[in-house]
């Protein structure tokens, strides 16, 4: 059964190049093993990548041992909900694809905050 997005419809693909998601399936699917709640589909920016690196999570450096190519501004990525909220508090939250953001993100982030940063609904 497909997981749902924050709008209650089927969760859509976030990104497949680079492959994202806790399960590396391109979607922000989650389960109880995903303690970081990698549920928010974002389009990363230079500012966010610098912020993440300053917090000890370098997303730009390739890590071949994890089949991770490193991210560049403009890449889609399933981000930990708490990290997105922290970035929002710091003024550098990346934009969000609501149709690709798992409903589980709502356990940590209010829908109205996510909607302020949405890029896929017009």
Walk through the language-model features, giving the residues of each.
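Short, basic/aromatic beta-hairpin or loop at an interaction surface
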Residues: 43-58
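Short alpha-helix capping/helix-loop boundary micro-motifs
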Residues: 60-67
């Amino acid at each position: 059964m497909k997981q749902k997005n924050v709008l209650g419809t089927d969760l859509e693909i976030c990104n497949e190049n680079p492959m994202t998601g806790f399960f590396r399936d391109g979607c922000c699917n989650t389960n109880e093993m995903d303690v970081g709640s990698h549920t928010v589909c974002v389009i990363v920016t230079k500012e966010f990548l610098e912020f993440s690196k300053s917090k000890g999570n370098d997303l730009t450096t390739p890590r071949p041992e994890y089949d991770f190519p490193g991210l560049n501004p403009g890449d889609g990525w399933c981000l930990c909900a708490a990290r997105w909220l922290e970035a929002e508090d710091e003024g550098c939250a990346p934009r969000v694809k609501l149709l690709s953001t798992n409903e589980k993100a709502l356990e940590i982030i209010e829908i109205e905050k996510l909607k302020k940063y949405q890029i896929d609904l017009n």
